[in-house]
Amino acid sequence: MIALDEFRQGLYPWGPEEGHMAIIRIYTGPDGKSHFQDIEPKLEPRGDQSEVAELIPGSGIVIRRFEPKRTNPWHHAPGRYAVFTLSGAVDIEIGDGTVRRLGPGDILIAEDLTGQGHATREVGPEPRVSVFVPLP
């Protein structure tokens, strides 16, 4: 099981496989720019043909719908959030020009609360629907 502090520090990088759900952390580095980090929770067998990771506490949910082609210039995350993409897709750009695309099933851990922040652009013909879960 992953300790919550290890999760926050992102101590378990992975290389996402084809067809594998992406869990991406975005955070502010010491250089004041946002950075990406791929993470994967360690899953433990439950004995009922399933696996489970340690609980990550959250409080409530916010459901947002973003119009196709919407852009949002450089901004910070409004707080620490786990963002679950249900439909549609979004490109997220960080300060060094790197762009990552999140689609249905992907999770973003948004922690870039200071510095330059990130920019987003909705892609595809359909709206993006995401669930935002505030994290402590």
Residues covered by each model-derived region:
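A short hydrophobic beta-strand segment most commonly corresponding to one strand
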Residues: I109-L113, A119, V123-P136
